[in-house]
UniProtKB/Swiss-Prot annotation:
This is MEMO1 family protein TRQ2_0860. NCBIfam families: AmmeMemoSam_B (TIGR04336). Belongs to the MEMO1 family. Signal peptide: none annotated. It comes from Thermotoga sp. (strain RQ2). It holds the Pfam family Memo.
């Protein structure tokens, strides 16, 4: 089954040439972006890495996302990419894995790695084959053009989380560590925005707690802060999955808000790029 783009023309351009140019400008942005283009990949990724990446419209979060993909390229070309995104639509299964076929973007198609899907499904108590959770969801889709831009041809496993409980995060982390035994060069992307629709000062404070939990590599601290500080982070389950995978290092690459782009600091959304290795 081919999954057609749901948010091309909304979150990012629907024309190939315009999309390539916008991604280029996200990398070359010197105010919020890294100010440089990624170098061509010359090596293979040898060990698993995790990436925290935002998923708003490219005009807002694209320059922050570019930091993560610029760094990921330096580790090498992945053998497979797993993208974990939150379910914003309420459709489908609690933990939905798109099982086969390919995903289309204006830059071409990306095949689903069926062997990697099999490994995850056979080692998870919660993950299920599911198309419906992905049909209208944007959180996974917006990562794919960046992947295509920096790596060219890759294969992937899309996982959409309606259930973002600690039990699911621990379960998925265990399944992904089994996957890494067969695909050592796996790149796992946790697609998330941080605090939503509060003023700049409040969002910077709340986002700092999320950043602390990631730097501490502590999933329990993440869940504790979400409740204690009332943080409206949408993709915390994917991030908690990464924090359960025993990465030795966590590096914060860039944090900004939509207000840093638009100038409107009254209701902003926080964006973060971080890499775990």
């Amino acid at each position: 089954m081919k999954r057609k783009p749901a948010v091309a023309g909304l979150f990012y351009p629907s024309r190939r040439d315009e999309l390539i140019e916008q991604i280029r400008m996200c990398f070359l942005d010197k105010r919020i972006g890294p100010g440089e283009l990624p170098v061509p990949v010359e090596t293979k990724l040898q060990n698993p890495i995790g990436l925290v990446s935002p998923h708003a419209g490219y005009i807002y979060s694209g320059p922050v996302a570019a930091w993560g993909f610029l760094e990921a390229v330096k580790f090498g070309e992945p053998s497979v990419v797993v993208i974990i995104g939150p379910n914003h639509t309420g459709l489908g299964r609690p933990v939905g894995v798109w099982p086969e076929g390919e995903w289309e973007t204006p830059l071409g198609t990306v095949p689903v790695n069926q062997r990697a899907v099999e490994v995850i499904l056979s080692n998870s108590r919660y993950a299920e084959e599911d198309f419906m959770s992905h049909i209208r969801e944007h959180s996974i889709e917006v990562q794919i053009p960046f992947l295509q831009f920096v790596f060219g041809e890759v294969s992937m496993v899309p996982i959409c989380l309606m259930d973002q409980s600690p039990a699911v995060a621990e379960d998925l982390a265990s399944a992904l560590m089994k996957l890494a035994a067969e695909f050592p060069g796996v790149l796992i992307i946790a697609s998330t925005d941080l605090n939503h629709y509060e003023d700049q000062r409040t969002t910077l404070r709340k986002d700092s707690y999320i950043i602390e939990a990631i730097k501490s590599n502590d999933p329990r601290l993440l869940y504790e802060y979400l409740v204690k500080e009332d943080i409206s982070m949408c993709g915390y389950g994917g991030v908690a999955t990464l924090l359960n995978m025993n990465f030795k290092n966590a590096r914060i690459l860039k944090h900004a808000t939509s207000g840093d782009v638009s100038g409107d600091k009254l209701e902003v959304v926080g964006y973060l790029s971080a890499i775990l290795f």
